[in-house]
Amino acid sequence: MDTKNDKINTMQPFAKGDIFLGCTYLNDEIDDHKGDGRILQYDKELNQKGVLWTQGTEHLVIGLTFDPNGILWGFDMHNHVVIRVAPDGIQLPNHHFADRAFSNATFDSQGNIYFGEGLVGNTPYPGSYLKRLPGLDLLGYGNIYKFNQEFEPVEVFEVANSPEFHHFKGVTHSTMHPSEGFITYTTEIGKKVMCYDIVSNKQMDDLVVLPGDLTDKVVAIAVNYLPDGRLLHTRGDYFEVLDYQGNVISTINLSEHGWGIAQITPASDGEHVFTANIFSGVMLKVKLDSGEVVGSIDTGFKVPKRSFGGVAEFTG
């Protein structure tokens, strides 16, 4: 159904509990992030329903998330492309928000959009093409950008980033606190979980600062808030649940499933979370209280053909 020689869109209208995975079909021998953009659709029982081959993309489709209107968003940050898919399963026309490497988004109840700029500086990832800013030898500024529901730019938040080993990552993951007063975010494989006050437009104290050097794998990766304000935080082969002060409430060890949990999202039932492991290519459905793995999906794309870069659930 979903091979590079048979690119037929079979995505179905969204149903409550459907799971969506960003999993580009990699097919370039030189560029290890390049291929045919693809979003896989599964039902709530984790049975495959369909596939959407994304238009206008050339590299990894990452950062899947839903807005309050049930539209699915995704990103090809390599080419400054923002993807939107309507609840009927049809991709909406691509809107060019900005010449920026947006890789994630979060939303407020007023319909405003807050994009995380996934790239920073001018040190490119050596294995893949990354588009520069127009007229500049620069990948990005690593900021957060606010747009209104008419897609008009409103404000740029010049946020802090956390140094990381590769020197090109900016705001790679972001999540809106339930109060809608601030955004919590990370620089993937950096040492910090950071917060920015979007009401007062100011950097807040870091929520988490990890010890060690940039090569020791003691790193911050993905974050996502639970509705009650607890924070999910992935650490490679496990994830933590943090309180509002950044203290660890609980730890779920998933080491038997490998290192590389690059995305995490809470399930709508309040009892489970979904994790995306970019190295193994496997999505896990995990009980939040016990850590029991109750379901999984193997995308078939693992190291070196790693492309599993997003997981989202349609809540109806």
Where does each model-flagged region fall?
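An edge-strand/N-cap motif at the start of beta-rich repeat modules
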Residues: 1-50
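Beta-rich, blade/repeat-based domains predominating
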Residues: 5-15, 56-68, 98-110, 116-121, ...
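Short, conserved, GDST-rich strand-edge loop motifs in beta-rich repeat architectures
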Residues: 17, 21-34, 116-139
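Conserved beta-propeller blade signature
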Residues: 18-21, 72-74, 112-114, 182-185, ...
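Residue-level signature of beta-propeller blades and closely related beta-rich strand-turn architectures
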Residues: 25-26, 78, 119-120, 189, ...
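A short loop-to-beta-strand structural motif that recurs across blades of beta-propeller domains
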Residues: 36-40, 81-83, 142-145, 192-194, ...
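A short beta-strand motif characteristic of beta-propeller blades
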Residues: 47-55, 90-96, 153-165, 202-215, ...
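Blade-level signature of beta-propeller repeat domains, shared across WD40, Kelch, NHL, RCC1
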Residues: 278-316
